Amino acid sequence: MVVDKARVVALIALNKDKMSNKIVDIQELRREFKMGGEIVKALKGVSFAIEPGEFVTIMGSSGSGKTTLLNTLGCLDKPTSGTYLLDNVDVKKLSRNELAKLRNQKIGFVFQSYNLLARTSAMENVELPLLYNSAVSAGERHKRAVEALEAVKLKDRLDHLPNQLSGGQQQRVAIARALVNQPVMILADEATGNLDTRTSYEIMSLFQELNKEGKTIIFVTHEPDIATFSSRTIVLKDGHIIKDSKNENIRSAKEMLAGLPTKDE
């Protein structure tokens, strides 16, 4: 099935004069699944919005609805009812192929397990999202990939394969890949889950730097200390939001990193 580009453009342009500047606008979102003869209600009327430039952490234990919400935010799943506007586009109205196009254009994904192609260089891994964008030439693709790797301080690792990089460096490549398509938001799923404390702080310091540059970041984690590096925390339980609050005392990951003992100590 060919993506109807004209329809996607039309949906984005629809009612432009009424558009808000919210990156994410979710209202009364519900998601139900059939498991055997039972109906499982994973999300039970969730509502929240995220403004440009926010750094939001989403937390919740197993069964809270966190994974379902993550899949919805990433346009990997559609709600049973309610609305999800991503950069003013109503996700529920899009076909599967249109959702894939929207994902590629609007969202930069960062995963816990990096999801890098093993036999592909850092540069080539970062270029991958741009291969699906026919408007980007090979020269522009190369330029953007270099700039993204420079932004995560890996300019000297362009030709390295994943197995030639540390875990922290692999995650930096994944972050560069998330940045390369100039998305409206970065969606990170447990991005420090496989890293030690020092490397976790290095990655969170990078996310804080990107946020200071104006990047909108949604960071899913189960670690309360990681949430303190963001400006806002949303907590889910049993399909409901039980907490949505600004973080009054945001920790600096750079300062926390500087306070760690050196390897020789």
Set out the residue ranges of the language-model regions:
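N-terminal amphipathic/basic-hydrophobic helices that include classical n-h-c signal peptides
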Residues: M1-K18
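Short coil/turn linker and secondary-structure boundary residues
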Residues: V3, L94, V136, E248-R251
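Intrinsically disordered, low-complexity regions
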Residues: K16, L128, A253-L257
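ABC family nucleotide-binding domain
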Residues: K22-L236
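Conserved beta-strand-loop-alpha-helix hinge in the C-terminal portion
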Residues: H240-D264
